[in-house]
Amino acid sequence: DCAKEGEVCSWGKKCCDLDNFYCPMEFIPHCKKYKPYVPVTTNCAKEGEVCGWGSKCCHGLDCPLAFIPYCEKYRGRND
């Protein structure tokens, strides 16, 4: 059993299309579509773009600890 776009993932349920979707680290995560990787020109990576590897996330976004991390919105923090 696997989760499609917008369906709840984790809890032992992975996204069906792992090449194009990821399961964000959230309390109740839903499968999200990767945004295609584009070189960061603004010196920061936007939501869904690859971070780490020398590129930091733009303000208000977090770079999760993952093999290929993608910027995601901060949770539980307001800054």
From Swiss-Prot:
This is Tau-theraphotoxin-Hs1a. The record marks 11, 27, 53, 67 as: Interacts with TRPV1 (reaches into the void formed by S4, S6 and pore-helix). It is found in: Secreted. Disulfide bonds join 2-16, 9-23, 15-31, 44-58, 51-63, 57-71. Residues 2-71 are annotated as: 2 X approximate repeats with cysteine pattern C-C-CC-C-C. It comes from Cyriopagopus schmidti (Chinese bird spider). The keyword Repeat applies. One of its GO terms (cellular component) is extracellular region. Changing residue 65 to A: Important decrease in activation of TRPV1 (in K2 synthetic construct). One of its GO terms (molecular function) is ion channel regulator activity.
